[in-house]
């Protein structure tokens, strides 16, 4: 029998500890009873596996009353109260210490939680302090106590608890930029009318993204196709300006001025999104979708924008000393299709440009139109931010709608934890069902809370087009009913789970067992989807700081190789980072999991230094197109040393310290190093979690 301690750890049930505690209560009351009487009382405690310490203590109080020792029961209650008070004081001191460390610029788990936030800066400090206060309020006043206990133990992780106390706040989204630009919007109480040029439309788009990012806590996605009509508007303007010239001269000048505006606009997009800051102290977590065929009416204009956004990203930006660096944002997604994947196809030149961009800047990420159409009812659309995908949904006219939709949040499951505490595989599946049911109920509660909130909490989202155009003062629920938004059940450590049940994950047998578990989760999630009429879906949790938390939670169990012998656990369904496998095999192995992970999934392959080898990237893209819906290519060759000008991989030790391999520079303010932390690129110089450091340092190249 095991007892669950208050910190979540399991330890063998020790009856003698209880005897000693009860004996102290008797002595405090000057009762001189024999040890046999005390043992008799303790022997009547009903103990089961994984019993909570509080349940044991509740039974002791009742038994002391049943045995007619009310004074001793009172003393025992007082004993519990004193210990609870001491724990509360300790918790309060811990909270105060965390706040003090944040505002004094010290490093802790909170400051290292997000690799894209510089916790040394005032605006980030303020956001982190506010976040810690909101976490405390949410946990004490709002959160389901059973789920909170599971969260604290590390069985699950309730993401973004620093925002959940604010009812109505939502996660990631596909911003309906088309509606806002074509029909106007309102920002900070000021009407922004339809722009009359691409240049103005792009500037407004960046302002919209910053405003939306400040009204939610997840990533935002837009598409270049929504800017494409303004390319035509600008072209028509230049044609009017030069209408009195000869046709040839007019064409030359129109093309010249139009290209200049396209170039300036895409540069504006890049610079604005990297220089503007949302209310949480960071650049908007923005994704830009590059799909040639999104709007066939404006395909020529869309192609021009896609080409230029790649060219601008290849140029990069400059760091403080003038060195060219790779900005972490915006994330780019490029769609591979039948007319751009093979040499000789109509748009293959754009794919070659995308490959060059990947070689130098680690973006874009890639969606296969062929595979996505199989999974998403013939549709092609981007993730919301990093990897969260919507389900197909039709409006009242029977038309598919994706832009203007959103996700309400994620709660993730630590799969290897459930496996390690289970008696066998069937017991594991039962525990998994139980956890999925609890999370589903909580997500339904969150959905209902959001539905009952007034739209004025975020006018740009609900009143002025980003998500909806509801009347001011109405309830959000009008916009998100009938499964309009998604709610995510995350999971991590599928590989460790499979290893625990005696199968090597990277094999065919491991793939089969992994897919069996995935399908089981998928089916159970769909049961709850129907039960609550809520668009619940499985989400491959990326984990940044959570990987450390989940790994630490596994340490209480006997150590098993490939399961709980590291400081991190593997993201979602991925093959472990240290597992030796070639990139093509990795893509083929992981591809089937994305169908079941319908609420969010992305795979990656680790590339060597590919700065001068776009052909290698093009070969990988063909494999992605034929096999996998969504994939990214990682490289470590985008780093820069400001001291000596070195470009390549900056080394990182197991404590997160950085060092230039060329000149030996270790001052993190003189180094620019970035890695794929989860789905987004993260800046190592901002600090990252212990588990993610170990994960990064253990990654093997797949080519």
Regions found by a protein language model. Give the residues of each.
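Charged, amphipathic alpha-helical regulatory modules used
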Residues: 1-105, 694-700
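Metallocofactor- and cofactor-centric catalytic cores in central/energy metabolism, strongly enriched
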Residues: 262-266, 270, 500, 688, ...
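Long insertion/accessory domains within large nucleic-acid-processing enzymes
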Residues: 662-703
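Conserved catalytic cores of very large enzyme subunits
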Residues: 92-484, 504-673
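Contiguous, well-ordered alpha-helical segments that form the cores/surfaces of helical PPI scaffolds
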Residues: 487-500, 519, 676
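Conformational switch/transducer regions in large eukaryotic molecular machines and scaffolds
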Residues: 14, 655, 679-680
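Buried hydrophobic packing segments
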Residues: 22, 227-231, 494-498, 674
């Amino acid at each position: 029998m095991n007892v669950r301690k208050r910190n979540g750890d399991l330890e063998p049930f020790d009856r003698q500890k209880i005897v000693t505690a009860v004996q102290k209560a008797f002595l405090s009351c000057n009762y001189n009873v024999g040890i046999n009487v005390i043992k008799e009382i303790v022997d009547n405690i009903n103990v089961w596996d994984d019993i909570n310490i509080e349940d044991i203590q509740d039974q002791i109080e009742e038994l002391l009353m049943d045995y007619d020792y009310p004074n001793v029961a009172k003393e025992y209650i007082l004993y519990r109260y004193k210990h609870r008070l001491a724990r509360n004081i300790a918790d309060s001191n811990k909270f105060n210490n965390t706040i003090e460390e944040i505002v004094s610029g010290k490093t802790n788990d909170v400051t290292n939680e997000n690799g894209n936030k510089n916790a040394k800066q005032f605006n980030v400090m303020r956001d982190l302090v506010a976040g810690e206060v909101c976490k405390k309020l949410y946990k004490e006043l709002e959160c389901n106590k059973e789920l909170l206990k599971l969260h604290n133990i590390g069985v699950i992780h309730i993401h973004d608890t620093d925002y959940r106390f604010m009812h109505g706040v939502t996660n990631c989204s596909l911003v309906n930029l088309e509606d806002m630009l074509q029909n106007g919007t309102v920002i900070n109480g000021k009407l922004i009318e339809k722009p009359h040029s691409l240049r103005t439309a792009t500037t407004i788009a960046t302002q919209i993204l910053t405003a939306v990012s400040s009204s939610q806590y997840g990533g935002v996605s837009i598409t270049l196709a929504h800017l494409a009509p303004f390319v035509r508007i600008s072209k028509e303007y230049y044609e009017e300006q030069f209408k009195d010239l000869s046709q040839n001269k007019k064409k030359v000048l129109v093309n010249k001025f139009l290209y200049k505006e396209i170039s300036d606009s895409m540069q504006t997009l890049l610079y604005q999104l990297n220089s503007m800051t949302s209310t949480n102290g960071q650049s908007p977590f923005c994704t830009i979708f590059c799909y040639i065929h999104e709007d066939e009416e404006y395909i020529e204009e869309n192609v021009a924008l896609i080409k230029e956004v790649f060219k601008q990203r290849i140029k990069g930006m400059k760091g403080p000393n003038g060195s060219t660096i790779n900005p972490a944002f915006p994330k780019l997604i490029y769609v591979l299709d039948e007319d751009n994947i093979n040499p000789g196809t109509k748009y293959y030149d754009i794919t070659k440009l995308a490959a060059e961009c990947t070689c130098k800047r680690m973006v874009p990420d890639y969606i296969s139109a062929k595979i996505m159409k199989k999974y998403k009812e013939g549709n092609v659309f981007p993730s919301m931010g990093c990897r969260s995908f919507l389900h197909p949904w039709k409006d009242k006219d029977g038309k598919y709608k994706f832009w203007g939709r959103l996700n309400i949040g994620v709660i993730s499951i630590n799969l290897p934890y459930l496996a390690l505490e289970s008696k066998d595989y069937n017991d594991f599946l039962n525990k998994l069902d139980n956890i999925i049911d609890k999370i589903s109920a909580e997500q339904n509660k969150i959905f209902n809370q959001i539905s009952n909130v007034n739209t004025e909490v975020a006018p740009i989202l609900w009143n002025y087009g980003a998500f909806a155009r509801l009347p001011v003062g109405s309830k959000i629920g009008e916009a998100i009913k009938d499964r309009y938004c998604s709610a995510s059940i995350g999971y991590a450590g599928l590989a460790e789970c499979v290893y625990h049940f005696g199968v090597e994950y990277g094999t065919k047998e491991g793939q089969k067992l992994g897919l069996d578990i995935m399908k089981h989760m998928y089916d159970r999630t769909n049961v709850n989807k129907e039960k609550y009429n809520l668009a619940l879906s499985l989400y491959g949790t990326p984990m940044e700081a959570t990987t450390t938390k989940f790994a630490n939670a596994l340490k209480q169990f006997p150590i098993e190789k490939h399961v709980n012998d590291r400081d991190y656990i593997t993201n979602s369904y991925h093959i472990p980072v240290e597992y030796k496998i070639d990139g093509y095999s990795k893509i083929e192995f992981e591809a089937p999991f994305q169908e079941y992970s319908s609420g969010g999934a992305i795979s990656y392959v680790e590339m060597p230094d590919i700065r001068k080898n776009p052909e290698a990237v093009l070969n990988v893209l063909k494999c992605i197109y034929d096999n996998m819906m969504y994939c990214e290519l990682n490289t470590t060759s985008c780093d820069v040393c400001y001291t000596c000008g070195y470009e390549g991989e900056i080394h990182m030790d197991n404590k997160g310290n950085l060092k230039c391999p060329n000149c030996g520079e270790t001052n993190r303010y003189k180094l620019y190093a970035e890695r794929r932390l989860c789905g987004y690129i993260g800046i190592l110089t901002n600090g990252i979690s212990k588990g993610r450091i170990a994960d990064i340092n253990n990654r093997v190249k797949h080519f």
